């Protein structure tokens, strides 16, 4: 990760001209970031502020997708597989099955190490933080935990209210955008529906748990009819909302843990 600061500097120079790519979709990712912002500890919030300045987690959550339009090899080749995981039906996740560049799980591990490394540069830590927020969101989208046979639903052609698209896009953005809400409106509505008990219950920092939840949900969302409209949206809206809420709570939980003072971590292990 030492050379990522160079790519970050290049990336920032292109940022204003880039149109968002889809992965959860920009609204979905911003929702998870906004929910996370509300659940950060004081220590985590201070560290995020040091790295991101006026940029909040809602904005940071979409940045790795924004950078997919950068033609540099880092974004087109190296970082491309970090948005998803492939686990074939009936298999367990094995990091050894990831591409040479890694996948979302291995990238999360590496970026976590960078964020906790006192010798890492601010640019490398900033890149790591943005990717951590984004990757945790992606791991909660069931089709970012694809089975390896249809590119995470991208090859499953469907019609969404008569418009040709694919199943991956339906889950990334179409079902969310159907509500015609801004990310802040949707995040506020979802946040108000999260009970204190759910915040405690969902406070899980294990990526394997998140991944297995997505795989279990993946099995239930493939339609028998390619013409999707109100029935499909109604059937799966609660599941989609839950994944967004889970992701937001867990982004915060993960960052609270990463930024927790070393002495506090040590005390918890005694």
What are the functions of these language-model segments?
Residues 6-17:
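Bacterial N-terminal signal peptides
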Residues 22-135, 142-270:
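N-terminal, motif-rich segments that launch catalysis or mediate targeting to/interaction with membranes
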Residues 1-5:
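Positively charged n-region of N-terminal signal peptides that target proteins for export
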């Amino acid at each position: 990760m030492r050379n990522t600061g160079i790519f970050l500097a290049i990336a920032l120079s292109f940022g204003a001209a880039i149109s968002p790519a889809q992965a959860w979709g920009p609204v979905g990712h911003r929702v998870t970031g906004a929910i996370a912002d509300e659940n950060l500890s004081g220590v985590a919030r201070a560290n995020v502020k040091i790295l991101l300045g006026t940029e909040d987690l809602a904005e940071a959550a979409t940045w790795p997708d924004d950078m997919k339009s950068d033609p540099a090899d880092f974004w087109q080749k190296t970082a491309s597989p970090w948005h998803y995981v492939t686990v074939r039906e009936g298999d367990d996740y094995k990091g050894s099955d990831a591409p040479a560049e890694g996948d979302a799980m291995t990238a999360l591990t590496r970026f976590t190490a960078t964020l906790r490394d006192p010798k890492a540069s601010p640019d490398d830590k900033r890149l790591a933080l943005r990717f951590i927020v984004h990757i945790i969101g992606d791991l909660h989208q069931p089709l970012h935990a694809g089975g390896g046979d249809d590119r995470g639903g991208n090859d499953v052609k469907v019609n969404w209210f008569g418009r040709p698209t694919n199943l991956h896009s339906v889950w990334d953005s179409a079902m969310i955008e159907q509500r015609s809400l801004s990310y802040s409106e949707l995040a506020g509505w979802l946040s108000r529906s999260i009970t204190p008990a759910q915040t405690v219950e969902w406070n899980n920092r294990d990526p394997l748990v998140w991944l297995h939840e997505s795989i279990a949900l993946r099995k239930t969302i493939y339609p028998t009819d390619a013409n999707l409209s109100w029935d499909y949206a109604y059937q799966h809206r609660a599941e989609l909302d839950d994944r967004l809420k889970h992701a937001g709570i867990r982004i915060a939980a993960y960052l609270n843990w990463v930024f927790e003072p070393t002495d506090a971590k040590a005390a918890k292990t005694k």
